[in-house]
């Protein structure tokens, strides 16, 4: 399975289902030491907006800082608008094959998709864990993400893409467990 527009749409749907089920009180729950549910959602929204920017403007701008205020008064609606725009942009012929500008050089949209599919899946899992409602990541999407990151080992080894110290999964771990371990989750 390729990490294409369809894979992004499936991963975004999982993320959307996860945040649509949140109660008002759950938005401020801690996801990790540095993240709350709302800051995690803002991070995904800002990241997913890069798909639309890449395809409509031909470039990806770096995201060094972000503010949860980007979500406005209705975080789910803001997420939905961003995801729908990205899905729409990906439906144009040859969208995933485009190469766009990036501060580090040229960047393939298909590589951005690999990052965004992974991000949507693991961030949904993070939020589900924080609120006590486990999120099921489909095995085929987890497998595809693992294949993607295996093909991008140099980026992983350069640092800043995945955690500096991934968790070692058990030898008999399934694809979902291995993906979570690769992204520093147990």
Regions found by a protein language model. Name each.
Residues 2-14, 21-31, 36, 53-71, ...:
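Structured surface interface patches that mediate subunit assembly and partner/cofactor docking
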